[in-house]
Amino acid sequence: RNLLSVAYKNVVGARRASWRIISSIEQKEESRGNEDHVSVIRDYRSRIEKELSDNCDGILKLLDTKLVPAASSGDSKVFYLKMKGDYHRYLAEFKTGAQRKEAAESTLTAYKAAQDIANAELAPTHPIRLGLALNFSVFYYEILNSPDRACNLAKQAFVEAIAELDTLGEDSYKDSTLIMQLLRDNLTLWTSDMQDEAADEITEEAAKQQKAVNNNKIAY
């Protein structure tokens, strides 16, 4: 189970990283007006997206037809449903329009199904339950653009795990505490971003009000 997950994660992870780099370069070249460069970069990006789609579709088919139906224990069900959500999320990262909407909806469905089982059958400190909370919160933040829900989910998972930290066995202590640290890091980052955005909005609103005052003065 873990070997399969790591194998696909390595293959898809490398292409996700390449896609991010290429997309960044494409934006820079577009801003500079280098259309010849942009055309070549787009072709390369399309090839990466094709490989990503094929890889994600391959593991999703395996999950739907074999792995999820055959899962019997609670942790196996959560593991494979989380995995299903992950690969739909990877598709949502680069798909557009109706395809992106479909991938996002499939991600949400898989994560929610996994969450229901995890909450009922796995301890708050279980690394698979924590990993699900981590990835689910990232989905809310990055794909659905919902920082409030992302922060609430991550915070709840972290607080619930902290409350039962003394029940952790040695075998899962390292994995669980590592994921908890990632949850806390994301919370710190996202909260900071939200505060920056709020400050920008306040500054913008103040500028508008000042402009209105100035306009009134001019009118008088």
Swiss-Prot record:
Q: Which GO terms describe its biological process?
A: protein localization; signal transduction
Which Pfam families would you find in this protein's record?
Answer: 14-3-3
**InterPro entries per record:** 14-3-3 (IPR000308), 14-3-3_CS (IPR023409), 14-3-3_dom_sf (IPR036815), 14-3-3_domain (IPR023410)
Q: Which Gene Ontology terms of cellular component type are present?
A: cytoplasm
Tell me the domain of life: Eukaryota
Task: Tell me its family.
Answer: Belongs to the 14-3-3 family.
The molecule here is called: 14-3-3-like protein
